[in-house]
Amino acid sequence: FLAGASLTAADVKANWEKHCQKCHGADGKGQTTMGKKLKVKDYTVAAEQKKFTDEEANKITSEGKKEGDKSLMKGFKGELSEQEIKDLTAYVRKFAK
C-alpha cells in the first residue's frame, strides 16, 4: 500500500483475516484453538474493550505483547503500516456490543 493511502473496508477485513483471525477469531470472540490457549479476550464484550485505549491497542499490534518472557502476540511493525494498524483497531472496536 502507498503511505497514507486510505484502505477500503475489504482491505481492513483482509488484514484481520490474514494477521488476527487465527487467534482472535472471525467474530472477535477469541474462541479459536490458539485464542483459547492464549486466553485471548472476547472483543464482543464492551467492558473488555474499555480496558484499553486505541493507542494501547495500536502499540500492542505494532510491538506485540509479552507476559514475562512468553510472547503472547507478535508485533506487526514492518508488516503493516501505521494506518493499517489504526484501521485494525477501529475494526476491533466494531465487535463490541
Model-derived features: where do they sit?
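The canonical Cys-X-X-Cys-His
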Residues: 16-26, 88
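Short sequence/structural segments immediately N-terminal
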Residues: 11-19, 68, 95-97
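Electrostatic cytochrome c docking/interface patches
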Residues: 2-17, 31, 51
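Axial heme c-ligation environment in periplasmic c-type cytochrome domains
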Residues: 31-46, 60-95
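Amphipathic alpha-helical interaction segments
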Residues: 9, 23-24, 51, 60, ...
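Intrinsic disorder/low-complexity segments
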Residues: 4-6, 47, 97
